Amino acid sequence: SGSGFSIEKMIRQVLKGIAILLALTVGTLFVFYLNRSDPWGQIPGKRLPGEAITEAIEDWSFTQQARGVTIEVRPSAPYSVNISCLFHDGAFYGLATSIENRWMQYLIQDPNIRFRVGDELYLGRATVVEDPQLVEDLFETLAQKYRGGADRTPEQKARYRFILIGSR
């Protein structure tokens, strides 16, 4: 009976240590989450750090090699996400996987954005592409760039929205 007590006590101490370690880990992650700026994977970020380039962009060809763009919407309470992007016919576009995305709702309310391509941060305005032929052309360009997706069904394509990203 004496050895059972010490094993029970040891198990309680180990469980207490695990609980403390878990609480510290969760607390640390919470602090990082609250103080983030850039988005991380699917977790949205806040205000993108850095000074934005304010000059109007005339030549968007520098975006051709970009695999993605980080876009910040809602200037009053910045909300940033990583999205796919493409260069098509001299213009720069981003892709939303759904019009229902929170960031898209913010963009519709206020088209003023900040966006980062590579290491540079820019001021811009974004508008949702409505022209059906242009949307079809953008899907073709997207399929070439990312090597896939050309076989999307019309129902799948209907969920996506392209945004034209321009200078402010």
Residue ranges, per PLM feature:
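Short beta-strand segments
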Residues: 63-98, 113, 125
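Short, conserved active-site entrance elements at the starts or edges of catalytic domains
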Residues: 32-79
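N-terminal amphipathic/basic-hydrophobic helices that include classical n-h-c signal peptides
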Residues: 1-9
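Feature marks short, highly hydrophobic, charge-poor N-terminal signal-anchor/signal peptide-like helices
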Residues: 12-14
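A short linear-motif detector with a strong N-terminal bias
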Residues: 48-51, 63-65, 72, 92-94, ...
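Hydrophobic membrane-insertion alpha-helices, especially the h-region
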Residues: 16-32
